[in-house]
């Protein structure tokens, strides 16, 4: 069975649009799991029915934490399921569930699959992610437009449209709770790729997405969490020299932005502070000795 997993944070209108884009007929069996990361948002319960389950978080768990709540529930119900994590501000433009089932029957080797993501105007928003450890570059790259392949292996995929093939995992997979928002998708992919799992992206089916229609409401928090997640990822997947060069560049850029974009600048500083606060004592010293 396919389980759509949506993390809601005061986004009932967007989730409603997503739900309405899902197929009405049940030729392909599916359920929708909504994790409510805004417990006082009662409006989301208007969507609840036999096919839509709402899991209420006690507090805002962040994107990864909310996904973990849903994935754990799904795994206990059906450890062989396909879990399709999809942003509240994304939606399907056509009934493609039969294609999803056929895809995983044809390519059971894939553990984590991203789909092509378009904006409502038809522009490609995501078609693959690359990571260059030697420079610390975490890139989006169109790996799909110039190929007829059914899928292309890649380094990471966006959490906007993120499909997990649970049957490939001996234990329930999870996002690292150290990430609150941003780069948790990158970390998930790199962590499981390092364990031998295949990460890929396809254009056989996809979603439409209105970029940052949720997070742009909260500019300071968006920049703080993205800066923190960026530094945490570089710390884990690059070396000390690359990390320090990227850190210095981030701080210099924040200083430049203080006058013209103070919210962005202070968000970057807050992200650096957030990263430094979580480091264990002697972190870099132990890394240099290892």
Describe each model-derived feature in a short phrase.
Residues 221-229, 235, 239-290:
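Non-catalytic, C-terminal membrane-associated alpha-helical segments of glycosyltransferases
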Residues 155-164, 168-174, 178-205:
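A short, conserved alpha-helix in the catalytic core of glycosyltransferases
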Residues 11-24:
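Short, well-formed alpha-helical segments that are part of the catalytic scaffolds
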Residues 57-77:
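Glycine-rich, basic loop-to-helix element that forms the pyrophosphate-binding segment
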Residues 80-91:
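Short beta-strand-to-loop acidic/aromatic patch adjacent to the donor-nucleotide binding site
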Residues 68, 90-172:
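Acidic/His-rich active-site region of diverse nucleotide-sugar glycosyltransferases
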Residues 36-45, 90:
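A conserved acidic beta->alpha catalytic loop
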Residues 29-39, 55-57:
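Short beta-strand/loop segment that forms part of the nucleotide-sugar
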